[in-house]
Amino acid sequence: MQVGCHVSISGGIDRSVDNAVERGCTAFQIFSRNPRGWRAKEISKDEAGTFKKKLKESKIEPSGTCVHMPYLPNLASTNDESHKKSVDTLIGEVERCGLLGIPFLVTHLGSHLGAGEEKGIERLVKAYKSAAGVKNGVTILLENTAGQKNSVGSEFGQLGSILSQLRPAKRFGVCLDTCHAFAYGYDLSTRAGAKKSFDEFDKKVGLDNLRVLHLNDAKAGCGSKLDRHYHVGLGSIGKEGMRAAARLASKRGIPMVVETPVDETRDDVGNIKAARALAG
């Protein structure tokens, strides 16, 4: 079972492996650089080598690791300047994943900025097709959104439609965020609701395309369109829904990453333990 959390790269990208080991991770996610800026410091061969050496020594399988895109890029942007910067960042992140030997890059689909879903998706597909030109084995993952205004990729049918336009198909997959799905309106809070939602995901996106699960509970209600993560099993989704998601991932060998708060209620270690217990 591959379970872990998002860990910091503060002090050097190899430190992320140390942070993952300290938390008992068998999977983990990182930002490869400062997520709040456009500029990225290059990863040297020595830095990449140290990261890969530590990862090998840690016994964490590379298949359980992923990089998350920075916050600023908007791949669905209809503003030419912003879109170009976003595409350049996407290409750069695919290259950085390749240097580190990390197989998955998690991407946000972005906002069409009021230009309409059709225009936004057109820009999004163009961005992904550009990134597919990078010659390495990195799989680019599309993460479902919580349904905020002007966002794309919240509804499973739309997510599946976008995915179906991308080639080569083997270069693309999906990262399902349980909090985002719940916030959009998929009621994961009961066993029956979770089954119905995952059946719909399978029909419209395909469980075979699910490569990483963001196992996050929700602070807000179902259909709220609010992206507010909460501790595993303690939020609005609750234990039944989190158990259904965790067991699905465990059964299919899909890495689970928690992106939950660290506060007086629980820390990363506590949420990883909760996820592991629910997965059985």
Swiss-Prot record:
One of its GO terms (molecular function) is DNA binding. It catalyses: Endonucleolytic cleavage to 5'-phosphooligonucleotide end-products. PROSITE patterns: AP_NUCLEASE_F2_2, AP_NUCLEASE_F2_3, AP_NUCLEASE_F2_4. The keyword Oxidoreductase does not apply. Its EC number is 3.1.21.2. Its cofactor is Zn(2+). Keywords: DNA damage, DNA repair, Endonuclease, Hydrolase, Metal-binding, Nuclease, Zinc. Zn(2+) 3 binds at residues 180, 227, 229. Pfam families: AP_endonuc_2. Zn(2+) 1 binds at residues 68, 108, 143. Binds 3 Zn(2+) ions. Gene3D superfamilies: Divalent-metal-dependent TIM barrel enzymes. It is an enzyme of class 3 (hydrolase). Zn(2+) 2 binds at residues 143, 177, 214, 259. One of its GO terms (biological process) is base-excision repair. InterPro entries: AP_endonuc_2, AP_endonuc_F2_Zn_BS, Xyl_isomerase-like_sf, Xyl_isomerase-like_TIM-brl. Endonuclease IV plays a role in DNA repair. It cleaves phosphodiester bonds at apurinic or apyrimidinic (AP) sites, generating a 3'-hydroxyl group and a 5'-terminal sugar phosphate. PANTHER family: APURINIC-APYRIMIDINIC ENDONUCLEASE, ENDONUCLEASE IV ENDODEOXYRIBONUCLEASE IV. Belongs to the AP endonuclease 2 family. HAMAP family: Nfo. This is Probable endonuclease 4. The gene is nfo.
